[in-house]
Structures are given as structure tokens and as C-alpha cells.
Amino acid sequence: MDLSEMRTRLRTDLHDEDAANYRWTDAELDRHIDRTVREFSLALPLEATATLTTAAGSRDLSIASLSDLVAIEAVEYPVGEYPLSFVRYSVWLNTLTMLIESTPSGGEDVSVYYTTLHTLDVSSSTIPPRFEDVIAGAAGGYAAVEWSSFATNRVNVGGQDVWRDYLTWGRERLADFQRDLAKHGRRNAVRVRRLYPPAAAPADQSTVQGP
């Protein structure tokens, strides 16, 4: 399903199919779709692999070329061994540092396993088909909630409470979206793997890092 097909699906769900009297412009719907895809990507990102090349005498690798990066998952070095040889690493801004004893020679391959944002554009989509309904529902929810805010205290053809109906419908769709993310998101998925983690776990509100 490409962007145009998703937009059409959205208009059907929102009962906004009268081209002469659209409630939402294409640009507005595209914005809600883009927001939904980004939020979906943070919970269920697209898995990818890139091959980077070492510089002589340096453990650092630039990851600036990894567009729409969500997270680095693992670093394989040297490549081509069996079992695969994963190394510890640290990341700061656009630099990945392999935490290895000896410095690499120049021109060696390093496989970086990472996750990235999904794409949904005019020609293609990386959203798994089974989640297209999830994207459509949430994007419709955002559109309905936004329109209800705009329509409050305005005269509407559907009646004075039509904004409230859209608000309720939109909130229900967004609640469904959050439940789907919680159910299918990577944090709740059982992933059997043995990869080396980053050098330090990211801090959160439950982590105390003292001297």
C-alpha cells in the first residue's frame, strides 16, 4: 500500500470521500500518516544492515550515512567468521567506536546491524501488510481529533455535536493504536539472540548513576 492508497483508505474511514467538499486536504492527511508511521517505527522499526569500512589505526566509524537511524543493534567485526564475531561498541552522535583491543587496519569491512524508520511514500512502503490497518486507524484518529478541535463552536452541517463524535472516534482509534504498539512493539517481543550490547546501557528515570 503506497501513500496514495493509504490516503484513500483514510478518507473512506473518515467518510470524507466528496472530492468537492473535503474536510481534510491531502497535505493534512499526509501529515497525520507521517506522524503515525514515525511513532510506529519507534516501536516496530525496520531492520537493516550496512557495511562500513575501517580507517587505518582507528576504531571509529562514521554512521552519518545511516539515514533515519533508530538504534544500533549489533556490530560484526571481523566479518565472514562463523560463528559471527560481534564486538562491543559505543555511540556518540554520528560516531560508532568499536571497543576492541587492537586497532583495525584500513579498508576492513564492518557489518552494522541497525533499525531505521519505515517509509510510506508515493511509490512504496516498508510497512508490513498486517499493520496497514493499524497505521490507517491511528492516522484517522489524529485527523479526527484535530478536526474536532477546529470544529468546536463552529456551525457544522452534521449538527452542533458532530465535533464531539469525531473527538470520541479519534480518541478510540488512538487508544487502539497504543494498545497495538504495546502488544507488538519490540520491547515486548521475545527475541532469541546473542549479540553484544553497547558499552553502557542508556539511562532512564529508574537508573541512578553515581560516582
What is each residue range found by the language model?
Residues 62-81:
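Solvent-exposed beta-hairpin/edge-strand motifs
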Residues 45, 56, 65-68, 93, ...:
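A generic structural signal for short, non-catalytic loop/turn and secondary-structure boundary residues
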Residues 50-67, 121-129, 157:
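Surface-exposed ligand/attachment interfaces on beta-rich extracellular proteins
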Residues 20, 56-58, 81, 159:
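Intrinsic-disorder/low-complexity loop/linker signature
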Residues 22-60:
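N-terminal interaction modules that seed assembly of large macromolecular complexes
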Residues 1-12, 27-42, 82-211:
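Internal mixed-charge
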Residues 19-22, 121-123:
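A generic structural signal for short coil/turn motifs at secondary-structure boundaries
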Residues 11-21:
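Structural recognition of short helix-loop-helix hairpins that underlie histone-fold modules
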